[in-house]
UniProtKB/Swiss-Prot annotation:
This is Small ribosomal subunit protein uS8. Keywords: Ribonucleoprotein, Ribosomal protein, RNA-binding, rRNA-binding. PANTHER family: 40S RIBOSOMAL PROTEIN S15A. GO terms for biological process: translation. PROSITE patterns: RIBOSOMAL_S8. SUPFAM superfamilies: Ribosomal protein S8. Transmembrane segments: none annotated. HAMAP family: Ribosomal_uS8_B. Belongs to the universal ribosomal protein uS8 family. Part of the 30S ribosomal subunit. Contacts proteins S5 and S12. One of the primary rRNA binding proteins, it binds directly to 16S rRNA central domain where it helps coordinate assembly of the platform of the 30S subunit. GO terms for cellular component: ribonucleoprotein complex; ribosome. NCBIfam families: PRK00136.1. The gene is rpsH.
Length: 131
């Protein structure tokens, strides 16, 4: 059976792995998932990630980050879903926790944070909030 929302599955795997204090989490890979992982790494929410290809299937392995025994990601929440897509213009991109968190946005110029999208002057689909 096919998965209806692979990005929500990725976020749930990260959330569940951090609740049981796993070092890393593995999931099926895609270009969008790798782009989201890159944003999470650039923002300091994860330590590292790697894509392992075996034949036709590739897997994304994310090394999770903890500080003082607690997960760095306190909240990770899907915003735009397959049943209800959420698009925002460059002036309407939300601010998460007054700038302490980030909104990950898929724009025509690639997947980026809300701050970078505002600075670049582009809007797009709000994928998730991370805090």
């Amino acid at each position: 059976m096919s998965m209806s929302d692979p990005i929500a599955d990725m976020l749930t795997r990260i959330r569940n792995a951090q609740m049981v204090e796993k070092v890393s989490v593995t999931m099926p890979s895609s270009k969008v998932k790798v782009a989201i992982a890159q944003v999470l790494k650039d923002e300091g929410y994860i330590d590292d990630f790697a894509v392992k290809s075996e034949g036709a299937k590739s897997e994304l392995n994310i090394v999770l980050k903890y500080y003082a025994g607690r997960p760095v990601i306190e909240r990770i929440e899907r915003v735009s879903k397959p049943g209800l897509r959420v698009y925002r213009g460059r002036n309407d991109i939300p601010v998460v926790m007054n700038g302490l968190g980030v909104a990950i946005v898929s724009t025509p110029k690639g997947v980026m944070t809300d701050r970078k999208a505002r600075a670049t002057g582009v809007g797009g689909e709000v994928i998730c909030y991370v805090a």
